[in-house]
Amino acid sequence: PSSIREIRFFTNLDKGFRFPALFIYLGSLIYWFIGNCFTRPPKLLSKKSINHLEPVVNTEKSIGGIEYSDAYLVEHDTRFVFQFIRRSLKAGCAAANYIESLGSEQQEDKTWLTKVRDTQTGKEWKVRSKIVINACGPFVDFQNSLSQQKGKHRHVFSKGIHLVVPRLTEVERVLTFFADDGRLFFAIPMGNRTVIGTTDNRVTEPETEVTDEDRRFVMENINKRVNLKQPLEEKDILSERWG
């Protein structure tokens, strides 16, 4: 519980959106009840309220919005993963970095032999275990093929990117919009930075990178939806996150 904290999401809705603000508000109420009403209740916001609470939001085409609560990682994702590994080590687990699996094979006694390789030295050896858990994310199918495991389903890949820029607002609140193509679009506070995104594009391979088109999409959409003294430009990008 100490790893997460409540944070408010602030959603602005523009004219022409596919649902009225009241409909979205009712959805947020259902979401709140599913969470046993543990957080602060959602609010239905007028255009005037949005201007008062978050003047950085462009309300020129606004029909109102909602404010609701969700949770976020206090330590952010990188530190969270590191702490997870540290706790696992204390519990008796063994963790190995830069080690890749070359496939697993089940033996006659029902145990598994997994061939692994140190990617820094090239050394290879085998590890015996009672079970093998394939938690390779987008590389699950590839790992299954190395182990001659077949299933009914295959992964379909979608790429999302975020851009990290200087902090846009002083309030610890996630700004939520709907981009030009209708997808959810966030401006997330993270320390003295703001993380903006995301895109959602179908790709054929899990290895991805940020393209000029990705940057242009994010920049155009955020500049339309916030009132800044100077519109964000590519030179304002401090770092990029994608996957």
Indicate where each model-derived feature is located.
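A conserved short coil-to-beta-strand element within the FAD-binding core of flavoproteins
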Residues: 97-113
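Active-site substrate-recognition segment that forms the wall
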Residues: 3-8, 103, 126-130, 134-243
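A structured beta-alpha segment of the ubiquitous adenosine-cofactor-binding alpha/beta core
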Residues: 115-126, 130
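Flavin (primarily FAD) cofactor-binding/catalytic cores of flavoenzymes
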Residues: 87, 99, 118, 224
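Dinucleotide-binding Rossmann-like beta1-alpha1 core, especially the glycine-rich loop
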Residues: 1-53
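Conserved Rossmann-fold dehydrogenase catalytic segment
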Residues: 7, 11, 15-18, 61-71, ...
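Short, hydrophobic/aromatic-rich segments at coil-to-beta transitions
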Residues: 110-115, 171-173
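Helix-loop-beta segment of a Rossmann-like dinucleotide-binding subdomain
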Residues: 51-91, 95, 113, 126-127, ...
